[in-house]
Amino acid sequence: MKTSLDPNTWAVPSPVWVVGTYDKEDKPNVMTAAWGGICNSRPPSIYVSLREATYSHGNIMERKAYTVSIPGDRYLKEADYIGIASGRDTDKLKDTALTPVRSDLVDAPYVDEFPLILECKVVHVKTLGLHTMFVGEIVGIKADEESLTNGRPDLQKIKPILFSSGDRGYHSVGSRLTEPFTQRKPPK
């Protein structure tokens, strides 16, 4: 029997994304965003939803660009700190000894130590209530070679951090189950 719950954000875990922006003084800033995902295949696009009160929100509105750096689990403490501190008050990259790198494709920085980077130009902005959704066309991807298998990002090598709003916890990725799109007949 199923139990009814009040509406909430308790979907499946989502990756911890570190959103990189520049402020008006060209200072790099990063923040974690739990709300985001792929929203289109062609052109490849993602979205991140940020509260207007965040420092990064204003930066994205000004620069019309952002990056998403996907941290591996060995950077859990840094990612957690980045999600708590505000770029208005401190230099989070300096505090965590992480290295900002200027994207050569968009007006935003990424974190060099993180294995997978998505470089995005803003193509749509939609206010949804408490959050603003920034849809970014992925104009470039950078990946550490050791995080790839056959030229593609490998989840087991990247070891991304997942956030679950249901239990308010960080999680890791389990093992690969099977190749997708192979069940051509109804299961018995």
Where are these regions (language model features)?
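Basic, polyanion-binding surface patches
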Residues: M1-K188
